[in-house]
A protein has these predicted regions:
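Acidic, Ala/Val/Gly-enriched low-complexity intrinsically disordered segments
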Residues: 7-10
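Well-ordered, non-transmembrane segments within structured domains
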Residues: 52-75, 80
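Extended, small-residue-rich solenoid/repeat segments and analogous flexible loops
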Residues: 14-57, 63, 183-189
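Glycine-rich hexapeptide-repeat left-handed beta-helix
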Residues: 22-30, 67, 73-75, 81-87, ...
Length: 189
């Protein structure tokens, strides 16, 4: 990483690290960290107390902004293009192992359990909890404090249960996304 120093109108000197041209910004003395074999796109943004596990992929124009609380991502987490992961001053944002966050989705101060899928342009609001292997449909809005049980599909505004997931449905999504990072972006030439 290359540190870049610049002066802002704020009273503190800002330090921004450039990693593979992604913006990795220290906030309140905390710098984002990531495990082995992670792909971070050239224009992704990670700030503050953000920790990624191994084999994660943060795609183009995705933002993981942890300026007032923590963001924790397990292993094999996939945050796709233009998605935003943020937290509140009282609630971290937690994405457990094998979570996939679709293009343009927002996860704000919520917990997403292992193997869950957040569809494209869906919104998951503060203190919501998405159960293991659950699927939130594209464009759905999971409202403040909603608890989505494991292995259910929810859709709509506000999101409601549509049906139970088919056996192995969420696992199939997780395999697909972990495959293309290895097949396309981390393969050796």
């Amino acid at each position: 990483m290359i540190p870049i120093f610049f002066v802002t109108f704020a009273p503190k000197l800002q330090i921004i690290y450039i990693f593979n041209m992604a913006i990795i910004k220290t906030v309140e003395g905390k710098t984002p960290q990531w495990g082995k074999n992670c792909f971070i796109a050239e224009n992704a943004v990670l700030t503050g107390d953000c920790i990624l596990g191994d084999d994660c992929s943060i795609w183009y124009s995705a933002v993981l902004r942890s300026d007032v609380d923590a963001i924790r991502c397990g292993n094999r987490v996939n945050v796709q293009d233009c998605a935003c992961i943020h937290q509140t001053g009282t609630m971290p944002c937690i994405l457990e192992d094998d979570v996939s966050v679709g293009h343009g989705a927002i996860v704000h101060g919520a917990t997403v359990r292992e193997g869950a899928l957040i569809g494209m342009n869906a919104t998951v609001l503060d203190k919501a909890e998405i159960g293991e292997g659950a699927i939130i449909a594209a464009g759905a809005v999971v409202t403040h404090g909603t608890k989505v049980p494991a292995h259910e599909i929810w859709a709509g505004i506000p999101a409601k249960k549509v049906k139970a997931c088919a056996p192995g449905q969420a696992e199939e999504f997780a395999k697909h996304y972990s495959g293309y990072i290895k097949d396309w972006y981390l393969k050796e030439d």
